[in-house]
Amino acid sequence: MDVRLIMKSARNAVIEIADGGIYNTKETYHILLNGEETFSTDTVINSLFDLKPQTKYEVLVKTADGVERGNVSFVTAYEFVTLNVRDFGAAGDGKQDDTKFIQAAILACPKESRVLVPKGTYRITSLFLKSNLRFELAKGAELVADTDRASYPKFPGVIESYDETSEYNLGTWEGNPLPMFAGIITGLDVENVLIYGKGTINGNASKENWWKNPKVMVGAFRPRLFFLSHSQNVTLCGVTFKNSPSWTLHPYFSDNLKFYGVTINNPSDSPNTDG
């Protein structure tokens, strides 16, 4: 059996327990991090969180009866600074609209640095990613989307170029260039982005709002919970996505995307949330 390092950053890592299983391992294992038992697992892909930058870690995998089955060592990446969204004005009380405060932290974040969303409930509309961003949703942190359509930016389907020889496509709906509301989390032409943690992104959709008359365009078509357009080298790790207004994860003309331990929770009868 092999224990492999799949990815690492300054604050998290992903390991693979290759015992012949596909999604689930053939037995339950205990994970020790620098000698301390961290958790038990029966899945092949496992995420490690709450790590420290530029720190050496050894991961040891044992069976339930204490037999060592494999290990892997690594040193976490460098981190320059952490920008806590609370320091930018976010309240995390579920009442204040925290969009502009979190967006300010994202725009202010330098390379090799982290935007941290600590425990709390953050009411938002659309957040826009930028390149070279590490964005952590801590355990107990939840981004909850507003359901007021008037609060969301709109993406036109097609914008004609000045010389009328080409066009710029922004909005999309079911394969056609049509107006759409910006995604709850949106990345346009971004690269080298990491979104990770034990937190939740909640689209807050229900049959009282986004899922009511879902095929009818009201202002624009429904937003995606996570929308990437013409982007590359984007990694999602550990985050839970729930109650999406439409498609949950929608990569559009994007490359080299990685998803590790992501959870998607939508009602089985919710419209178009299977993406």
Please describe what each predicted stretch is:
Residues M1-G275:
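Extracellular/periplasmic carbohydrate-active domains that bind, remodel
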